[in-house]
Amino acid sequence: MTKALIVVDVQPTFCESGELGVAGGNAVAERIADYVNAHRSEYAYIATTQDWHIEPGAHWSAEPDFVDTWPKHGAAGTLNAELHPAIKALNIEHHFKKGQYSAAYSGFESIEDNTDRIQTREEVEAEQSAGKTLANALKAAGVSRVDVVGIAESHCVKDTALDAKKLGFEVTVFEDLTVPVSEELGVAARKQMAAGGITLAESR
């Protein structure tokens, strides 16, 4: 069975001291890096996703509700929107960016972009229309199973995993390689993923 690893949103913006920092984010980044170094040969395809917000509309708010609206985070072109240093050092080949001009949680809402440039709305839409999506990339690589890791389990990891399952992939989320915004939201996310047919496991 051909496998892919999706590393979701492991960026300083979601780690301690980031704009939407999650407790344990830096430690998860280091564990993911260790895992990739030990298991890289098992995967036919490895991809990262990033929040890469340019003008995401109401997704950013000065008075966020932390459900549909959020403080400014993942701002394209800033250091905090880049990959976490531990992940950047892995030199992963395929990078997908999402949320440029709207809210986006799932990695399957992203387009492949291996640069850090600021694209126009028209450029983003053109690349979406051209099929430069994560789903198409995985299918082109012959992938049938995906392992999902990253930040945050309760939000973008969950949505990426659920979308992968809906697209017909066998999906595993490694619980020791992700972290939720809160334990309560993590419990709810794990219940939702399990109900959606996603395997929850440890990476070792």
Where do the language-model regions lie?
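Short, glycine/acidic-enriched loop or turn micro-motifs at the edges of active sites
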Residues: 12, 54, 153, 178-179
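Short, flexible loop segments at boundaries between secondary-structure elements
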Residues: 172-186
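Active-site flanking residues adjacent to catalytic metal/cofactor-binding acidic residues
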Residues: 8, 50, 175
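Extreme N-terminal starter segment of soluble prokaryotic enzymes
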Residues: 1-5
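Short acidic-hydrophobic, aromatic-tinged amphipathic segments that line or gate anion-handling sites
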Residues: 199-204
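Acidic/histidine-rich helix-loop elements
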Residues: 15-25
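Active-site alpha/beta core segments
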Residues: 30-145
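Histidine-anchored nucleotide/phosphate-binding helix
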Residues: 35-36, 157-166
